[in-house]
Amino acid sequence: GANEKASENLTVVPLTVTIAGKDFLDNEDLNMEEFLTSMEENTEEGRTSCPSIDEWLKALEGSKRAVMLTITSGLSGSFSSAYQAKQIYEKDNPGSKVIVVDSRTAGPEISVIQREIKRLVEDKSVRFVDIEQKISEYKTHTHLLVILQSLHNLALNGRVNIAVAKMAKVLNIDVVGTASEEGKLE
């Protein structure tokens, strides 16, 4: 996610958010202040683009084992493109094993899941083939709430009634949300 530092063992494959014709990559180089200002000042619907299969494949290059964690499939095609990349990569690289995890969430909870994946990968007592099941179990016990300070972008994208968004702004109401079992914002 945004501002998540890439390292020797972690590669960020970013989503692209397009606002008023300007692309913002959701990676460590994202200028959050500029991004949020653009969202707030924008009067048109923004767009998001998930990473392509080729972008996932590039991130996998040279890996014998990899775990790919995506934003919820309830909001993005990232899981689908990552899973297709996994299938291609494993076919083209016999002996490789790729695990694709649908976070079923967005925001800070993804970082919590990512840290648990890292812990499991580094734990010599955990077999790589068991990581997928362990993460699935872990996700059932991990839930974070999201506070939306503005409904502006959701209203532009038709996910919230524009009158409700304006009323929330006038009354200075922050909305609390969470992800459903399917990974959709509630």
Q: Residue ranges of each PLM-predicted region?
A:
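Mixed-charge interfacial surface used for oligomerization/domain docking
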Residues: 1-17, 75-78, 83-87, 99, ...
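N-terminal glycine-rich phosphate/adenylate-binding segment common to multiple enzyme folds
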Residues: 52-89
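Short acidic, glycine/Ser/Thr-rich loop/turn "cap" segments at secondary-structure junctions
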Residues: 68-70, 98-102
